[in-house]
Each structure stands twice: as C-alpha cells, then as structure tokens.
C-alpha cells in the first residue's frame, strides 16, 4: 500500500525515525512527513540549523546515535552517508525494523504527484528553488524538497496545495534513477561520487537511465553547453528532451545580452521549441543572484515553465520573487570596503564558477579576489586532485585549510597542505597558502582586504559556520 494512501486509512505507521536528520536531504523529507501528519523523530551527531528548525515544529531530536533512540519506532530512514556500523542501524537490523533509504522515501512521496526531479553535478539546489518560485507565480503552489535552505521560506522543504512536487534528486549513490519523476532536469555531469560509481562512464549511464525511465508523456530538460550532457542527449531518442544553454546556438532555449553585478543578473532569452511557441524572445529577465552558472540554472526553470504554459509574466514575476538560497554566493560580512561571501562550492567546477563570478565583479571595482577554501572529503580530493590544482585561476590569492573529513578516514598524502604544495610546485598559482586553523581566516582578511575586493569562503564542511561568525569576529579585532 502506498505511503500516502496508508495515511488516509485507519492504519498507522507509528513512528518514523530519521538517522542523520540534520542533513539537508533528510530534514526536508522529515518535515514533509511531519506536515502530512506522521509522527517523526530523528537523531544526528550535532545540533545545526535544520535540527533546531525541526525541533521548533515539535519533532523530537536526539543528539548522538544510540540504540535506545529506536525503541518505539516502526521504520528507520537512512541516507547513503550513514555507516553500517552505526548503533541505530545495528539495533534496527537486530529487531528487524525496516530500514528505508532516503531515496525510497522520497520516491514514495513523489509517486502520487506530478513530479519534477532536478539532477546534475552542480546547480541542483538553486535550480530547484528558482523553479519553485516560477510555479508559485503561475498559481501552482508545489510541494518542494530541496538540498538547501530557500531564503523565501527559511526552510528546505514545504508542503504545497497543488498536484506538483519539485525535488532535488541526489545522484551520489544512483538511487535517483528510481525516482518516479514526470519531468527530469540535468544541469551538468562531472566526475563526482566516484567512490561509489568507480568510473565516470557508470555515472553517465546512471544519468541516462534517469531520463529513459521517464514515462512516455514526460520530458527532460538538459543543458547542452556541457559536453557530456550534449552527448547524452544525442544518444537518447525515445524521450522528449528540451535543451538550453548560453553557448549552444542549437539549444531550444538560449540566454544572450547578459549583464551581471554583485546582486543580480539580467539577460534576454530566445525560445525555439517545436510545437510550443515557435521562435520567441523574452527581454530583460532579471534574477536576483549573480553569475553565468545561475543564468543557466534559471534557463532550466524557464524551460519547464514554457512547457507547462506558465506565460512570460509568471516567469518574470517568479524570478523577481526569488530571494536566493542559503550558502549560494551569500554575503556574510564587510571589512575595509571588501565584501565577504560564503559559498557551498566544494567541487572544482563549482569553485571555478564561483570564482569567475567574483572575478567579474572585482574587476568592475578594481579589486582582487581572495579565495579561502576548505576541502571536503578525502575521497573527493583524491579522485579530483589535478582538477583542484587548476580551479583557482580566477583568484589573486588562495588560502586552503585542512580537509573536512565528513566521516571519512584520512588517505595518506591527501591533505590541504599537499594541495598547496602541488599548486605551487606545478606553477598553477604563485599565491597559494595553507591555513592550519580556521581562526587564521580572520587574520588573512585583516591583513589583505582592500576596497573593491571579493573574499570568497568556500566549502561544504564547517567553514560555513565560521564564515557566519566573521562579522562579529572582525568587529572584535578592530
């Protein structure tokens, strides 16, 4: 029996326990189930923004993991980040409590909706958020499950009143190919999560299945500026695919006349989708977030809006209402007329896109770009070491901390210091420095910040918490 049907009967699911409930993906699903009337609880190692938010809704949160936490639960939901040695998993196995993967629970929520699944190596969260704003502007309030905090809502998930559900589809362990989506988005495909997939071709194959698993009446939206995505699109003939890009003249949706500053991007769009609009120009679309990569993200949302006949007014209004996403080029401080930005970038391609945006802004202000980066996961650094060496070219100064483990064991020779040494040795940059402590970031800013500078703090680890305290820390040092 389907999960949502079960709720409509007199049967109950008793308690659903989320292991790692503070994660962005897990917290979103937990919140939706809570809003649907299910009894939800969860555990995580540390308190964070998500656990505090869920607790404020009346959801019981355990800090730390212990077998006692699942004494009276019927189901345990886990993500791929949870180790099989976790005491709560061991207890669930011992007591034969069903263990459900996050993707399976997400799929169940999506099954009875017209679902939009947003996938890709980068840009998923912003694309999902932009699309949600367009749906609302079109009068369709969707249910949304996102991988980041949507500033408009101060949450990463909310229950809507329409028959649409928009979800970020996590490709990290291939479970996304089983999501029952009607509309599938692929923003890009880069070598990522190779600790799971083992090789790039297997990862590409998973994205192909993601599209071919669509129902015959569904469609995919793909960015063909990305070489791998273009090849994938060329290989698929059995599903409808709408393409978009900036550099691809043969794309169905193309952005041009682009202007960007520290707070926004403005552009025109040419639309040429057979049997939909013919050739149409939409002038002066503005999104309140900078960067070429975010223009591409907005084109994916526009493609869906055009296919669903939202209308040009709804598309423009939706973007005007967008307030951004937490940790996506977020201003956290100013010092000596320099701006400090916090960003989630943790993959070489994300770092390049973020620094390119900063470079564009800094050049207009006669400033420099100072990049401060905390690497995330030893396995990612090992697989993409050469790419990490080459991704900081748009920065004038680079500061790299030690690697945030995210539960992984250290790998010999894979360190932040080693990355700095190799960047210098191979002459990729002559201003690369190692930071032994996060606290040293304060001194870097005080010693180097000047008017017009863009100071970009990047990483998927705990550097964000530190970045959000910088305004106070810098004030106390002046």
From Swiss-Prot:
Subcellular location: Cytoplasm
Keyword check for Cell division: yes
InterPro entries the record matches: Mur-like_cat_sf, Mur_ligase_C, Mur_ligase_C_dom_sf, Mur_ligase_cen, Mur_ligase_N, MurCDEF_pg_biosynth, UDP-N-AcMur_Ala_ligase_MurC
GO molecular function, one term: ATP binding
Known catalytic reactions: UDP-N-acetyl-alpha-D-muramate + L-alanine + ATP = UDP-N-acetyl-alpha-D-muramoyl-L-alanine + ADP + phosphate + H(+)
Biological process, per Gene Ontology: cell division; cell wall organization; peptidoglycan biosynthetic process; regulation of cell shape
Keyword annotations of the record: ATP-binding, Cell cycle, Cell division, Cell shape, Cell wall biogenesis/degradation, Cytoplasm, Ligase, Nucleotide-binding, Peptidoglycan synthesis
Main location: cytoplasm
Pathway, per record: Cell wall biogenesis; peptidoglycan biosynthesis
Full protein name: UDP-N-acetylmuramate--L-alanine ligase
Organism: Rickettsia akari (strain Hartford)
